[in-house]
From Swiss-Prot:
Belongs to the shikimate kinase family. Its cofactor is Mg(2+). Catalyzes the specific phosphorylation of the 3-hydroxyl group of shikimic acid using ATP as a cosubstrate. It comes from Chlorobium phaeovibrioides (strain DSM 265 / 1930) (Prosthecochloris vibrioformis (strain DSM 265)). The keyword Kinase applies. GO terms for molecular function: ATP binding; magnesium ion binding; shikimate kinase activity. This is Shikimate kinase.
Amino acid sequence: MEKQHSLIFLTGFSGSGKSSIGPLLANSLGYDFIDIDSAIEEQEGKTITRIFAEEGERAFRKLEQAMIATIAERKEMVASLGGGALEHTPTFELISTTGTLVYLKSDPKNLAKRLFHKTDRPLLRSSGTEKPDREALERNISAILEKRSPRYESAAITVYTDQKRIGSTVEELTRKIERFVRKQSSIEQNDQHKDRP
């Protein structure tokens, strides 16, 4: 499967801004947009929370991988991933070999602030409680981030989303992605010229 540098996979923890930044970024780049979680919900006719509750995380990760596989050869598309998508190794490998990974980075304190009132994040609920206190949530986020960090940090492009307007983040991402795609295309063209007899 050929790598498409203009197939942009947005990753980051829940609350990092993928769903709000994704459509604006796609519009800025002139690309199509897909939110993988929303596409799965539409396909399955149930929420992600319900899929986790009824079928478990493993079943959800398989649905997620299959959905990503359907767009793996697309060009000029921004795909917003679920926060834990990269934990599933086959999905991580599929993304790494088919597109460009972009990490929206945010610190645990800011993530906890944004996620405190959300009830639709199945992996963030502490055992036995629907909604943990803010400090417990921050500790939970820090622990999950530590586990996910190596794959998040493998992204070709990283942008910090803390203390920034969404518009500024979109502008920064647009510049970095356009520069990256141009550079990779140029490298590939040079390699093709070298391969010619």
